[in-house]
Amino acid sequence: MLWFKNLMVYRLSREISLRAEEMEKQLASMAFTPCGSQDMAKMGWVPPMGSHSDALTHVANGQIVICARKEEKILPSPVIKQALEAKIAKLEAEQARKLKKTEKDSLKDEVLHSLLPRAFSRFSQTMMWIDTVNGLIMVDCASAKKAEDTLALLRKSLGSLPVVPLSMENPIELTLTEWVRSGSTAQGFQLLDEAELKSLLEDGGVIRAKKQDLTSEEITNHIEAGKVVTKLALDWQQRIQFVMCDDGSLKRLKFCDELRDQNEDIDREDFAQRFDADFILMTGELAALIQNLIEGLGGEAQR
């Protein structure tokens, strides 16, 4: 659960107080509570260590991890449509007239309210890591929307959260394209066998290469024809593999077995100690990877 699978990276745009003791109280005000009978969705904080601790924050070496849970009620459109049509047909038969659009819209709200208490719930959890040493916030999710929702919850909890997506001085896609074109990456990184190339033209095509030599003539021809690399699978120090995206996010993080097994000497029964050790190990590696990546991509954009 702890090992992050994706990274959406944000930079704190100014210094703010992020002390765990203070945060614990602030997050408690927005702790997760389940949906009521008429709620479509609810989001709040839960302990990152699950049932093993009541604490809403876990801290080590200036790194803080927190966890947001979201509950969403599932009401399939066909179910709503069927119930609404039945209600409309019944009323039209009783009143011997066609209902107006405003009346139908009002009925739809009634139908939704009647169905909500019986709807199934879908739960999801999103981990967030706050690096107070380097002034970064990382969200473990694959979509910017989900990351923004989690950041919005934190902003509401803290009262203020001045963050911007981490951005580079040079467009990331141009740097990735040059790495593939030349076959030479920044120090510490190696090309793997997967990439996505897009045409710069609005209605241009997209090429997805998998299990392919990215230095081959076929890929070079696409680049010479005007396509740029928007996603690129990379290996870092033979420790972490990931897909670098042109929006600055890292997808499909895969930690090498040697790295993941580093804390195997800790008894798995001692969940808290193992969680803490894995958290220190993971954040240490990822912080080094992010720093290496910033340098390799030509440096962070000036703010």
Swiss-Prot record:
GO cellular component: bacterial nucleoid; cytoplasm
Key words of the record: Cytoplasm, DNA recombination
One example of a Gene Ontology biological process annotation: DNA recombination
Cytoplasm in keyword set: yes
Main location: cytoplasm
Cellular location(s): Cytoplasm, Nucleoid
InterPro entries: RdgC
GO molecular-function terms, A-Z: double-stranded DNA binding
Protein name per the record: Recombination-associated protein RdgC
Organism, as annotated: Escherichia coli O6:H1 (strain CFT073 / ATCC 700928 / UPEC)
Top-level taxonomy: Bacteria, Pseudomonadati, Pseudomonadota, Gammaproteobacteria, Enterobacterales
